[in-house]
Amino acid sequence: MPFSHYAVLDGDNFYEARKLVGESDLIVLAGGHVPTQNAFFQKIRLPELLRDYGGVVLGISAGSMNMAATVYAQPEEPGESSPEYERFIPGLGLTDVNILPHYQKVKDYTVDGLRLFEEITYPDSEGNCFFVLPDGSYIYQDEERLLLCGKGYSLADGVMQQLTEDGEILNLNEE
C-alpha cells in the first residue's frame, strides 16, 4: 500500500489534531510512557476525534495500551509502584483489550524494589484480564474478529496462563 504523504502529530502541532486525523487513512500510535502519551491524547481530544474515524488505527507498545477503553498503565518508572499512582486511566475506547507488551524484556523488572509482575501486576489483575505479549506478537481486531497472533498469555485474577505459541493464531471471540 504505497502512500504519498505522512504527518506527525505531536506537541509542536497539537492544534492541528482535528485536521490531521480527519485527513488520515492510517493512524500509528507509537510507543512511549503510557500516562504521558495518554495525557497528550486527552489534551488533543483524540478519543472524540476517533469516534467517527473510518481509517485504520495501529498501536505499537504504549500506543496499543492506550487504545483500550480503560488503560492499565503498568508501573515502569520510579515512584509508580505507589498506591497514589493512577494505574487505571481512561483510554481511547477503541477496544476492551488490555495489552502488556515487551514481556520477554520486562518480565524480570523491578520498580521501587518490587517485582513488576509478581508483586505489582499480578495483584492488579484481580478482576481484570491483561494480554501479555512478547515482541513480535500482536492482537488484531476488526468489526468481526479479535485475534491473538503469535505467542501470548492471559493474566487474570492473579493467574498467568499461556494461550498460544509463536506462529499460532487464536480467535479470542471463541474463548
PLM features: what roles do these ranges have?
Residues M1-L26, A30, Q161-E168, L172-E175:
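N-terminal beta1-alpha1 cap of cysteine-dependent amidohydrolase-like domains
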Residues P2-F3, L29-P35, N98-P101:
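Short, basic, glycine/proline-bearing loop/turn elements
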Residues A30, R51-T70:
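Catalytic nucleophile loop
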Residues Q37-N38, A68, P75:
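Glycine/Thr-rich phosphate-binding loops of Rossmann-like dinucleotide-binding domains
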